[in-house]
Amino acid sequence: MAQLSRRHAIAGLAAAAAASATRSRSVKAAEPVTVWWTQGFYEAENKAVIDKLAAWEKATGTKVNLTIMNGPDLITKLIAAMQVGDVPDLVHSVTGDRFLVPRAAWDDQLVDVTDVIDTQKSEFHPTAMLGSRFYNAKLKKHAFYTVPIKCSTLMEQVWRPLIEEAGFTDADMPKTHDAYFDFFQIVHDKLRAKGKRIYGLGYSMAAKEADSGTLFHHFLVAYGGKDIVLPSGKLNLDDAVVQKATVTALERLTTPYKKGYVPPGAINWGDVDNNNAFFAKQIVMTPNATISIAVAQMEKADQYYKQIITQGIPLGNDGKPVPGILAVAPCLIPKGAKNIDAAKDLLRSFIKPDNLNQYLKETRGRFLPVMMSNIKSDPYWQDPSDPHRHIAVETGLTKPTIPWWMNYNPAYSAVLSEQIWSQAEANITQKNITPEQAAEEAVGRIKTIFERFKIA
């Protein structure tokens, strides 16, 4: 996933319409709404939110001050803002569900938005709902502290011309987990035999940002580790099945790297770098958190429709479906916001099914809807002539999914922030310790973290 560095701001469009009868009764036009929004991978994503907020601004007469910034910067600045008490009214953070919200909710730093959720409660995907509930240690209960806007799960992106150059077709790609990823090592060997300096696997393996952790945890689930944290919030790392899954996931991700099937630089990749390596045809395939790779090439018809393959999560080695981990990109309202009523009014408008669907379509469908009615009523999402979107919808919305584990216990947000599993991979690839040793060290650190987060 890529983040850019530009900022946008929209000014008021309809000050003269402040007395409009269409203004929401809960909004005071004299009070502007300050919004921070995560920057998109391409300009269409930024334009989509600018247009939506401008329309709400015009309808209500309430000025919106919008700042669009890259994801990591947004989280860093919001944490600092919450510490000094000078916060925006509304925030959309693509990775906030993992790296920000769980501990902010724990510390009672977010506004409960259950009343906003309730306006569309029957519309939301069940896993998206689970992914929006977090535990408040002060109140000793779970509540909705975010409003789901869009979601995603891991996808596989493959260059068809490269597998064909190696002598294979789409039908040759195996369906089960280990066989699937091993296939690209075979493709790698065949391309190298032809003198091509191309890597079979584009694994993100850096101890930073989000993609590496996403990849590890999908491998963890594929090997039976989905119960690493129980719904009660209890850490379950002493379970034999989970223990084995952690070791196997580490071994299966690091061994291809050590054998040269993954680019050496992958240990330093940020979230954009696997995309760039794919576009440069340095790698045959890469797991990616959205279909951003394909969507970014939409204007290049041959690449979008013929050359880039989007595939869902492989079956488990037992031939059974592996649940996807559904990441929910949320909106939230920090405590201390100056215009909470207007922020909630804006959110209620934004998540009306037709509004939310139109926004996601204007972003080119990089992320999935969080409302099942959108995919059922709008053929855009399951159009069989599009080789990417309907695969993403099937993987993330119609097949089994699970929430991230920080929805059960915010301690797991700290696990992700500290990059514990990615650091374990680095210890294997760079310090030559065994997967068993790396897993043992990681488990010890995780247990220490969980001691700080007791669910009542």
Report residues per predicted region:
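C-terminal lobe and pocket-closing loops
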Residues: 291-304, 317-419
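Extracytoplasmic "Venus flytrap"/periplasmic binding protein-like
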Residues: 51-131, 164-167, 172-175, 276-277, ...
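N-terminal export signals
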Residues: 2, 8-27
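Conserved C-terminal helix/tail region of periplasmic/extracytoplasmic solute-binding proteins
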Residues: 31-33, 63-64, 164, 189, ...
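Hinge/lid segment of periplasmic solute-binding proteins
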Residues: 95-155, 212-215, 309-313, 383, ...
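Extracytoplasmic/periplasmic solute-binding protein
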Residues: 136-149, 154, 181-235, 283
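Short, solvent-exposed loop/beta-turn-alpha elements that line the ligand-binding surface or hinge
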Residues: 112-127, 173, 192-193, 203-206, ...
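Glycine-centered hinge/linker elements that transmit conformational signals in sensory
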Residues: 182-188, 230-267, 309, 313
